[in-house]
Swiss-Prot record:
Annotated InterPro entries: SpoVT-AbrB_dom (IPR007159), Toxin_SymE-like (IPR014944), TypeI_TA_SymE (IPR020883)
Entry GO CC: cytoplasm
Keyword set, alphabetical order: Cytoplasm, DNA-binding, Endonuclease, Hydrolase, Nuclease, RNA-binding
Domain of life: Bacteria
GO BP annotations listed: RNA metabolic process
Biological role: Involved in the degradation and recycling of damaged RNA. It is itself a target for degradation by the ATP-dependent protease Lon.
Protein's recorded name: Endoribonuclease SymE
NCBIfam families referenced in this protein's UniProt entry, alphabetically: PRK13605.1
Length: 113
């Protein structure tokens, strides 16, 4: 039992009742035997408002009686330099040497013969 002088600290719920959604597990049929498999479909403008825009990668954690969906942050865009480096790596050895020589000239280094 709690102490008579204990006071419960008020807190704000992480999920307000206005943000709750009610769903029903339906089914999808699987070809070729058309067996029914459980399915949950989520759709609506509220998904984007919650951080789940079209194309967002989603991490799914499954526990007994609980599924947690977490939007993954977008991958950092690769710099132009790194994209160019990847293209150079696909070139022949001779062309790669030419690119290295060009970089040396641009950087101001003199080629020692």
């Amino acid at each position: 039992m709690t102490d008579t002088h204990s006071i419960a600290q008020p807190f704000e719920a992480e999920v307000s009742p206005a943000n709750n959604r009610q769903l029903t597990v339906s089914y999808a049929s699987r070809y070729p035997d058309y067996s029914r498999i459980p399915a949950i479909t989520l759709k609506g403008q509220w998904l984007e408002a919650a951080g789940f825009a079209t194309g967002t990668a989603v991490d799914v954690k499954v526990m007994e009686g609980c599924i947690v969906l977490t939007a993954q942050p977008p991958a950092a865009a690769e710099s132009e330099l790194m994209q160019s480096l990847r293209q150079v790596c696909k070139l022949s050895a001779r062309k790669q040497r030419q690119v290295q020589e060009f970089i040396g000239v641009i950087a101001g280094k003199q080629k020692v013969a």
